[in-house]
Amino acid sequence: HSDINVIQLNNPDEFKLQWHKLKFHKINFGGIPTGEKCLILDIDWIITGNIDDILDYDLPERTFGCFERWWSNLRSFCKINGGFQMFYMGDTHQLWTTFKKAPEHWQEYYIKEGLAVGPVNGEQNFIDTHISLDRVWLPMEWFAKHHEDEYFKIQLNWHMEVNKKEPYFMSGEFCDTIKMVHFSNANNSMELIKEDWINDFWY
């Protein structure tokens, strides 16, 4: 598509996997003008509803848009989902400068401290720890995670934290409020899961 600008990594081995996302916070990354609204999304999201409310979200200046990963029992270690970050270009440059000073240290730190599960992880912990802007929390009911191995835990957290009346997922359908579904975790590949709803929304 002519409106899509693909930016190749100059050195894919410079950082470990998802830690490359920290580059997005470098001021004017990809030629994006200072002050332009940015949204970082991981590639393992599936859009299941109307996301206009997300794309048009009125994020105040000098704030960081995120949501609480309600499905996790480790929120005391890291509250945000690193696969969704909303900000204005230039406001988060400090994340990049802090990381760039000691990338080897930070890429191992949260795993060594028992705050993230290896072999590669911790970038969302880094952002959660080092973001200096006020946070704006988008509604939790817009977002969900799908992981068959954690279904009952996710369902329980949904009822306890988000919606006591409706299930988050039943008979191949998500709750009407859910707009995006994340397949986080290294062993949770959406292309390997054979469910009709994935075909309906993704392929």
Which residues fall in each region the model found?
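Catalytic core and acceptor-binding pocket of nucleotide-sugar-dependent glycosyltransferases
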Residues: 89-203
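GT-A fold catalytic core of metal-dependent nucleotide-sugar glycosyltransferases
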Residues: 6-8, 17-80, 86-89
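Conserved beta-strand termini and adjacent loop/short-helix elements that scaffold enzyme active sites
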Residues: 9-11, 67, 138-141
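A short acidic, often aromatic-flanked loop/helix-cap motif at beta-alpha or helix-coil junctions
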Residues: 11-18, 72-73, 143-149
